[in-house]
Amino acid sequence: MHASAHRPFYSLFLENSMKTFFFFTYVSLAAMLSLGAQTAMAQVPAKAAACLACHGENGNSSMPNTPSLAGQNARYLYLQLRDFQEGRRDNAMMSAMTAGLSKADMQELAKYFSEQKLTNKRFNADPEKVKKGIAKANETLCAMCHLGEFKGQNEIPKVAGQNFDYVVKTLKDFKAKDRNNDAGNMTSVASTLSEEDIDNLAHYIASLN
């Protein structure tokens, strides 16, 4: 019998996921280099290069469920990397990617992505949903932590202009308590949101520049 038959499913899943990740990392980096991006890549910290396959060039993700990191608060980015490494956020891929990072590595990555410019994705938001999203944001006092227009501060993330699908996923994860590395603040807020509220908020947030 093949040896893999005796291995746990999660072990095989993680191994296959990592193989797929590294394949697409290689393809993505090769594509960027082939398009004449050698100079830009030379400015990317070595440990940040692997992040680009999912989070996009300069941290601008084109993958709906993967967040853009460009322009994000450095303090927030550092804390999330640390939470992935220490198991406070549950994501097999990110846990594997952060496993070997030192504190200095995580700070360097956070600084690099915080200094990149978030590009305008020109999200085609529904005006009526945006209006309702604004009303819900005011009702739930989002600006008390995220500040006006969701620009964030320190360990509170900037979410303005974030990918629509990722915003929806994040709010649903907090509501379902699948994510809980926020000292309970977002879990408490998200528990009051309906599916419609989440959709409206995501339209509003994704429409912000």
Spans of model-derived segments:
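Bacterial N-terminal signal peptides that target proteins for export
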Residues: N16-V27
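Sequence/structural segment immediately N-terminal to covalent heme-attachment motifs in c-type
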Residues: A40-N60, K121, A125-G148, N163
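Gly/Gly-Pro-rich "capping" loops immediately C-terminal to redox-active cysteine motifs
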Residues: G59-R89, S95-L101, N138, F150-A176, ...
